[in-house]
Amino acid sequence: MLSTVTYAKKVKVEKEISDREYWTQMAYKIAAPVLSNMSKGELKKNMQVEISPTWDGRSKDVTYMECFGRLMSGIAPWLSLPDDDTEEGKMRRQLREWALKSYAHAVNPDSPDYLLWRNEGQPLVDAAYIASSFLRAKKQLWEPLDEVTKQRYIKEFQLLRRIDPPYTNWLLFSAMIESFLMEADAQYDLFRIHTAVRKAEEWYVGDGWYSDGETFAFDYYNSYVIQPMFVQVMQTVNDHKVILHDRSLEMQKKTEDLAKKRMQRFGMILERFISPEASFPVFGRSMTYRLGVFQPLSMLCWKDMLPKELPEGQVRNALTCVMKRLFAVDGNFNEKGFLQLGFAGHQTGLADWYSNNGSMYITSEVFLPLGLPASHSFWTAKPQDWTSKKAWSGHEFPKDHAIHY
């Protein structure tokens, strides 16, 4: 038998890493297989596509735009940070270089990785996430593209007007695309923006929640789409001082401010959903979107908009522990490093009829706080227990009350 001392010497002691190091390593792990392949025009060649057992029969080629668009929307803020010679900086620079080449392949009809822009309705969804990535990191991800590539994007975005979105969260996909066209100084359709804004306002049901269309559904689409995209659209329109029909800029600014306050309330609800054990409730459709659930909370962190009830160290600790718990489960990734269908691990039966493993990359939206530099207080603040952990440990924690705006 080995002595205790001898055995201890044989055990590899892993260096304890910071929360930020864990986040960046996980973001790189998710992004690298996608971008390293797509930068060479080899994503379609090498990505193992996995579709839901109840797939509706649409072209499986929608997978690649879902994968690329959702990934880039989540990591764009991180890639917008300036270069440095740290290990993180090297990863970030490599991903950005791959991403810029991938953006070009996505709209080049002669590339093997030209995405499915002109068939099916699904491209409206994931083009909106590509537009989101450009809005979130315009200087680093849009401006360096050559003029031919930029014009190709503008054309593809405009051609998506062929799709008549249903009166659900899909209206915001159209609005996101048109908002980016506004940002890019291209021809845009203000009616599509205004329609989405009007309907989002109508669909607010109270206490930080919007319905997804006329009827309320208890799911996480407030996280995946509605709240972040509504705020992004209003910010873009107001930044450009474009007046929507029958409104004033002052009215629109109030709409933006109100949407942000409601997102703060929703962020508080999401934080309270996190159990003492760092799990969160599994309900509603699209549960395979994993940590995309926390996009509003992550966006509040990135934009320095956390409400006073949520200290930065508390939110960072909560999100880190949830991330570690979920990704510690075997089966989240396949042998080539691509995400698989499932929530915690590989659970194909959870996938909805519209889901493929490209859809899973919306989990990247949790990484928005990486857009804050390592020196920011979000990353340096002392970790604190989150609300439910305080509550179930017998410690003081804030009371909770509904909002009425």
Predicted regions and their residues:
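N-terminal export leaders
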Residues: 1-2
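Terminal, non-catalytic domain-edge segments
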Residues: 7-56, 60, 77, 81, ...
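Structured alpha-helical bundle/scaffold domains in large eukaryotic membrane-trafficking regulators
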Residues: 83-87, 142, 241, 375-382
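Aromatic-lined, polymer-binding surfaces characteristic
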Residues: 64, 75-78, 92-244, 248, ...
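An acidic intrinsically disordered interaction segment
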Residues: 18-45, 87-101, 139-147, 182-201, ...
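N-terminal carbohydrate-binding/catalytic regions of secreted carbohydrate-active enzymes
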Residues: 59-84, 88
